[in-house]
Amino acid sequence: MNKIKSLFAAITLATCILAVIPAVAQSTSEAQSAASLAVVMEFLANTAPDKVEAAAERLAAPDATYVSLNFDNPELRKILPWTGTNKGPKAFSSLFLQVQDYWKIEDFTVSTKISSGEDVAIFGKFTYRSVAVDQVFTSPFSIHAKVRDGKMTYFQFMEDTYASASSFRQSGSWTVKTSANAAPFTVAAD
């Protein structure tokens, strides 16, 4: 009889432990998701020229990867020199320091924030005015970031690069052929 009671007690204890494990895992995952989102949002809240270097040092891992607009496009880099893949906290801060020389930020609105463990996705829109030619454009944006141990290890920022690069255009046109069956057409500055 004692063996049956001991066996029953062991089964009851095991059942309780197994019931708690998913709840603990879920709360750990939720806590990690919230912490990851908080790191990215803190960085975005501190991108002003007088704050961004300290924020990047504090919130980006030493070997973090920043992908801005594309992996590597030499032609676009001539227009937007921060584009491509760069490494370390300086990649995060130098981008925002350069942007202020090119555009006046008229609006930057986050509309959606999603986090799952170390992954964070941010969506929104911004309106910039080019400093040199006074062209205004509005673009959607998206961010995918990864956060480990309280530091961003990966940050990819995407926007409408046609609109952003066009905000500097003063003249010129392209003749474009988009598909084999389409007639060529011209895209020109307004």
Report each predicted region and the residues it spans:
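Hydrophobic pocket/interface hotspot
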Residues: 40, 55-56, 64, 88, ...
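A beta-strand edge to alpha-helix "cap/lid" segment located at domain peripheries
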Residues: 26-32, 100-190
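Short, low-complexity N-terminal intrinsically disordered segments enriched in polar/charged residues
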Residues: 21-62, 175-190
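Bacterial N-terminal signal peptides
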Residues: 10-20
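A cross-domain feature marking catalytic cores of carbohydrate-active enzymes
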Residues: 37, 68, 156
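Bacterial N-terminal signal peptides that target proteins for export
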Residues: 1-11
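A solvent-exposed, acidic/Ser-Thr-rich amphipathic alpha-helical stretch
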Residues: 58, 62-117
